[in-house]
């Protein structure tokens, strides 16, 4: 008489195992192709937010380790736009990152918020985060190249791209399928719809074939490639039918209800707070839990920088396409 073996408990995934191969590739490329003289990344910080300052320090440490020249410029808010324009014009600067939020919801003279205006003011040749209007528009339209000849790939937002790489590493993407179909049949719930993380992430996953339930505090929509669809699903029902749940709730008190998590689900936390009871989650059979994505995000930042360098500063184009 045979019996079915019991499913094992959940597994905690260290982001370093995903980030390290990218960092090694960056170091090797800079040493061999650029003779040790890496591209220059400028970070602009105009507020005292400790989380942003910590991220800036972390970025600088990783860049210096891997051969990228990194300079953090701390300025007053009123001087931020001028500092950004200066970095745009500096031929020795190959990438720019602004540490948001800078002005919060404060409106811009030009329409939208001041932070929106700053994002759109970064040159497409230096937008290492891929958040300016040009790259955002291409992302939502599923346009993957800068040029008509399709020799220069677009830059994608760092944290959403990091999550894609994590899902590839964990086998959620089906590499046997053509690009654009590797998530076909996969349901994913993203609990965040910010313009920085949740919305572009939902679009990227939908562009790869997934059905993505996008949840924020007031609504839930279904993202399919090129479509935003009303749905009768609730956060609970969406999570229960999802193979992947991604949490990005910027509130310390929020916890993902464990009864919403099915066996063998991938759970990824992108918030600065832990959105899940880790001990309880890891009791669910087959769960794979990624508590932090920062190391992969920084690796994607470096990857984007080298892609920008090849697209606009180096010919012929080589590895990072």
Predicted regions and their residues:
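Acidic-glycine-rich active-site phosphate/pyrophosphate-binding loop
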Residues: 127, 136-141, 271-284
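Glycine-rich phosphate/diphosphate-binding loop of Rossmann-like nucleotide-binding domains
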Residues: 46-61, 145, 150-256, 260, ...
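Generic structural signal for well-ordered, non-membrane alpha-helical segments
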Residues: 15-23, 52, 56, 77-80, ...
């Amino acid at each position: 008489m045979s019996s079915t073996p019991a499913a094992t408990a959940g597994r905690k995934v260290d982001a370093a195992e995903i980030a390290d191969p990218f960092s090694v590739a960056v170091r090797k490329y800079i040493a061999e192709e650029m003779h040790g003289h890496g591209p220059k990344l400028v970070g602009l910080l105009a507020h005292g937010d400790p989380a942003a300052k910590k991220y800036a320090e972390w970025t600088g440490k990783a860049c210096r380790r891997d051969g990228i020249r990194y300079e953090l410029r701390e300025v007053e808010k009123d001087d931020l736009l001028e500092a950004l324009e200066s970095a745009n014009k500096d031929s020795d600067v190959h990438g720019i990152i602004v540490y948001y939020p800078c002005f919060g919801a404060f409106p811009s003279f030009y329409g939208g918020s001041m932070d929106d205006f700053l994002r759109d003011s970064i040159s497409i040749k230096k937008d290492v985060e891929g958040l300016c209007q040009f790259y955002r528009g291409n992302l939502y339209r599923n346009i993957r190249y800068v040029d008509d000849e399709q020799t220069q790939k677009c830059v994608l937002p760092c944290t959403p791209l990091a999550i894609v790489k994590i899902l590839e590493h964990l086998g959620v993407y089906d590499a046997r399928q053509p690009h654009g179909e590797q998530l076909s049949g996969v349901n994913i719930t993203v609990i965040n719809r910010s313009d920085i993380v949740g919305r572009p992430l939902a679009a990227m996953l939908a562009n790869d074939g997934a059905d993505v339930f996008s949840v924020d505090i007031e609504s839930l929509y279904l993202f399919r490639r090129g479509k935003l669809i009303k749905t009768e699903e609730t956060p609970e029902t969406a999570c229960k039918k999802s193979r992947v749940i991604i949490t990005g709730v910027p509130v310390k008190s929020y916890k993902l209800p464990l009864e919403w998590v099915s066996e063998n689900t991938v759970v990824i936390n992108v918030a600065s707070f832990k959105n899940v009871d880790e001990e309880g989650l890891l009791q669910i059979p087959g769960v794979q839990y990624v508590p932090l994505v920062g190391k992969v995000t920084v690796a994607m930042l470096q990857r984007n920088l080298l892609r920008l360098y090849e697209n606009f500063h180096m010919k012929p184009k080589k590895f990072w396409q």
